[in-house]
Amino acid sequence: MSRSGPQQRRGNTRQRIQDVALELFAEQGYEKTSLREIAERLEVTKAALYYHFKTKEDIIISLFEDQTRPIDELIAWAEEQPRTLDTKREILRRYSEAMAGGASLYRFMQENQASLRELSIGERVKQRLFALVELLRTGREDAPLADQVRCVSALFTLHAGMMFLQHIEGDPEETRQAALEVATDLITQAHEQA
């Protein structure tokens, strides 16, 4: 049975607001974008926008929660798994896919780090990254420092692939796969040394 009526329209409007807001934030920056501009781009009244979101921060928080749900699920899954090389490879694979699914949000976050520090989601971003780093570490407190750096570097290789290699020629999926391959090599080397 398909959804129709007010419930579906509300869902579509909420999604449209998120999409347009993220587009404007990317074009103009978070600080320089107003709710009025978002409403104008959507061709809705400010009252219609306020029905869904009272502030720009509310929009960003909703985007963040929607797009990072797969990462929260990944962390919960990984916490229940043994700290094997296969688990760590799967963490990297799933994280890479989650980042690809929320690419526009992650680019926004990268480009607006100063603004995000002021928002309530800034701390949650750090907490997720630290949780992932801990899950990727070798599992031994006495692991050589170089191997611990490899584990952290594996995670940030995926970020670099998305954020800094987006302007190179080629298919974005090929770039993501190449970054995942390098990240997997790093975690494998760290695990084999441990």
Question: Language-model segments: what does each one mean?
Answer:
Residues 78, 82, 113, 165-169:
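Secondary-structure edge/capping motif, primarily at the C-terminal ends of alpha-helices
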Residues 62, 73-105:
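Hydrophobic alpha-helical connector segments
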Residues 1-12, 168, 192-194:
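N-terminal intrinsically disordered/low-complexity leader segments
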Residues 109-115:
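Short linear capping/connector segments at secondary-structure termini
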Residues 16, 20, 24-58, 62:
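Helix-turn-helix
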Residues 106-107, 118-130, 136-194:
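Hydrophobic/aromatic-rich alpha-helical bundle segments in the mid-to-C-terminal region
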